[in-house]
Amino acid sequence: PMTDVLAAGDISKAVAAFAAPESFNHKIEEEELGLILKVLLAAGDKDGDGKIGVDEFVTLVSE
């Protein structure tokens, strides 16, 4: 589970950060999940290859 990598509180903060104002119903919709993944990839892909390698992922979740 994600809680093996991230604290539950950090996961909750991340979900809240991506919620559209006035629309969040404590569920992630397909469109929101797509946005989350695009932002995550952009933030983690430091070498610009369109992928997140292990080192990039570790750096991303450690920040």
Swiss-Prot record:
Entry keywords, A to Z: Calcium, Cytoplasm, Metal-binding, Repeat, Secreted
InterPro entries for this protein: EF-hand-dom_pair (IPR011992), EF_Hand_1_Ca_BS (IPR018247)
Main localization, broad class: cytoplasm
GO CC terms, sorted: cytoplasm; extracellular region
Binding sites annotated in the UniProt record for Ca(2+) 1: E29, E32
Family label: Belongs to the parvalbumin family.
Annotated EF-hand domain residues: 28-38, 39-63
The protein's role, per its UniProt record: In muscle, parvalbumin is thought to be involved in relaxation after contraction. It binds two calcium ions.
GO molecular function per UniProt: metal ion binding
Binding site for Ca(2+) 2: D45, D47, D49, K51, E56
SUPFAM superfamilies reported in the protein's UniProt record: EF-hand
Keyword Repeat: yes
Protein name: Parvalbumin alpha
Keyword Cytoplasm included in the entry's annotation: yes
Expression (tissue specificity): Detected in muscle and cutaneous mucus. In the skin, detected in cells in the basal region of the glandular epithelium of the dermal mucus glands (at protein level).
Location(s) in or outside the cell: Cytoplasm; Secreted
